[in-house]
Amino acid sequence: MASHVIEIARQEGAEFRSVRLTLEDDGTIKMDAQDIGPTVTRIWGDDDYEFGVSVPAASLPQLAFELLREKFLGQLGAVDAFREWCTTHGVQHEFDSWI
């Protein structure tokens, strides 16, 4: 059973899509989607199509590094912005400064 699941995007209507983000009990991060609608039926011959990407816990440091690099690249205020982001999202962190 997944320890935490949230829906991060949803499109209602004839061409339905739901995108979920899951943190599994073993630390795996998974992003998956479900499509329902006439396009799915036409292409796959079924009423729904599900697909996703899983990143094992052992790869999370690399994932975090690359996401942070992409988010903050070129920003001179990156340290302050990162500290604020961690605080806002309840991510345990430590701020340090020295002279």
Regions found by a protein language model. Give the residues of each.
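A short, structured beta-strand/loop element
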Residues: 20-57
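Short, charged/polar N-terminal "headpieces" of proteins
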Residues: 1-29
